[in-house]
Amino acid sequence: VLATRGYGEANSTPAGGQGAGEAVSRASKHDWGGKDYRELMTCVDTASRLFSLGEKRWGVMGGSYGGFLTNWIIGHTDRFSCAVAERSTCNRYSQAGTSDCAFRYGEYEFDGLPWDHPDHYLAHSPITYVRSIHTPLLLIHGDEDMNCPISQSEEMFSALRLLHKEVYFARFPGQSHGMSARGTPNCRLDRYRLLLWWMDRYLDREGTAEAEKEEQDV
């Protein structure tokens, strides 16, 4: 969909990602926002060099673990003109008690429960770095997401609004963690419309007739 608007995409499977083998999937254990973040920035550096892209011509987006990384990235660099975090998390401590994974997932990832290692959980939570965020952020979340509860986006949205940062929160009623692939047709179409509106708004400042019409409709 983004390609139809003239955007290129740089995709990567960093440490912690799936589809490149167990070693890669396990490589971010204990260190969410560490090696994975560095590898993604290397991908951006390489693509920028190969295609002569300026610093202000980049957006960043991701869902689930990629949504976590999006929230993390914009708290650690200002190189992106806009960001989209879908079904994301921002607070590893609070997520541990609200996700359908319960406490076991965090116990595996961080070798202990939140109250055993509170500093470690918060050090690897994007919400901790919210004051450093200057990138406009679009949050997309289904309110029946049990894996990454919508309260995670609510936390991020509330914090950014409190700090007078630029943020937009799209809440999709009745949609689960898999909305982008298995959601109702109208919600999936609305999601695409939001993505294009947000990217056009910040990556194409001059705008187009289509972008201007969509902004009026949002």
What are these regions (language model features)?
Residues 1-5, 9-218:
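Active-site-proximal cap/loop segments of hydrolase catalytic domains
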